[in-house]
């Protein structure tokens, strides 16, 4: 469950995601291959 401020960005492992308008989903994330 994602909880974020709409319009802001947040980290998901090594990727940066933009928060969706509902504050409960990612509108889009960078797709870098994160080291394990």
UniProtKB/Swiss-Prot annotation:
Please give the Pfam families that the UniProt record associates with this protein. Pacifastin_I (PF05375)
- The residues forming the signal peptide are none
Name the source's superkingdom. Eukaryota
Query: What residues does the record give for site: Reactive bond?
Result: 31-32
Q: Could you give a GO molecular-function term held by this entry?
A: serine-type endopeptidase inhibitor activity
Disulfide bonding pattern of the chain: 4-19, 14-34, 17-29
Q: Which residues form the Pacifastin domain?
A: 1-36
Organs and tissues of expression: Expressed in hemolymph.
Please provide the record's keywords in A-Z order: Disulfide bond, Protease inhibitor, Secreted, Serine protease inhibitor
Write down any Gene Ontology CC term: extracellular region
Please indicate if the UniProt record lists Secreted as a keyword: yes
Q: What is its main location?
A: secreted
Its localization reads: Secreted
The UniProt family comment states: Belongs to the protease inhibitor I19 family.
Briefly, what is this protein's role?
A: Probable serine protease inhibitor.
Q: What's the protein called, per UniProt?
A: Serine protease inhibitor 2
